[in-house]
């Protein structure tokens, strides 16, 4: 018996699938998981720069300023504002003379 006779057989001048297992819940679950996987893969490829940049740089918020005096908080804010975004999250401090 060949694979062709097990999967597809000619039915009244058309090709059809003679699968009785298509109502099996395992087959339905596998189909849903496969479709979800494909959708997530496509979204990942479309938005990978945005997603991974957000994960890599968005979670790094710097040290907490809780418990510090207001003067030290202001100094920290000024240092952060003096940093200039050069390329893809790489920072450089610019000092004016």
Swiss-Prot record:
The M2 protein from most influenza A strains is inhibited by amantadine and rimantadine, resulting in viral uncoating incapacity. Emergence of amantadine-resistant variants is usually rapid. GO terms for biological process: protein complex oligomerization; symbiont genome entry into host cell via pore formation in plasma membrane; symbiont-mediated suppression of host autophagy. The gene is M. The record marks 37 as: Essential for channel activity, possibly by being protonated during channel activation, and by forming the channel gate and the selective filter. Cytoplasmic tail plays an important role in virion assembly and morphogenesis. A lipid is attached at residue 50 (S-palmitoyl cysteine). Glycans are attached at residue 20. Keywords: Disulfide bond, Glycoprotein, Host cell membrane, Host membrane, Host-virus interaction, Hydrogen ion transport, Inhibition of host autophagy by virus, Ion channel, Ion transport, Lipoprotein, Membrane, Palmitate, Phosphoprotein, Signal-anchor, Transmembrane, Transmembrane helix, Transport, Viral ion channel, Virion. InterPro entries: Flu_M2. Residues 44-97 are intravirion. When the channel is activated, one or more imidazole moieties of His-37 probably become bi-protonated. It comes from Influenza A virus (strain A/Swine/May/1954 H1N1). It is a single-pass type III membrane protein. It is found in: Virion membrane; Host apical cell membrane. GO terms for cellular component: host cell plasma membrane; membrane; virion membrane. Its main location: virion. This is Matrix protein 2. It comes from the Viruses. Forms a proton-selective ion channel that is necessary for the efficient release of the viral genome during virus entry. After attaching to the cell surface, the virion enters the cell by endocytosis. Acidification of the endosome triggers M2 ion channel activity. One of its GO terms (molecular function) is proton transmembrane transporter activity. Homotetramer; composed of two disulfide-linked dimers held together by non-covalent interactions. May interact with matrix protein 1. The record marks 41 as: Seems to be involved in pH gating. The modification Phosphoserine is found at residues 64, 82. HAMAP family: INFV_M2.
């Amino acid at each position: 018996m060949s694979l062709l006779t097990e999967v597809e057989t000619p039915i009244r001048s058309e090709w059809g699938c003679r699968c009785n297992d298509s109502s099996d819940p395992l087959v339905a679950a596998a189909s849903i998981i496969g479709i979800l996987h494909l959708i997530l893969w496509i979204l990942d490829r479309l938005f990978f720069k945005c997603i991974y940049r957000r994960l890599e740089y968005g979670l790094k918020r710097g040290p907490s300023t809780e418990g510090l005096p207001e003067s030290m908080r202001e100094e920290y804010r000024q240092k952060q504002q003096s940093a200039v975004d050069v390329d893809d999250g790489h920072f450089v401090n610019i000092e004016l003379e």
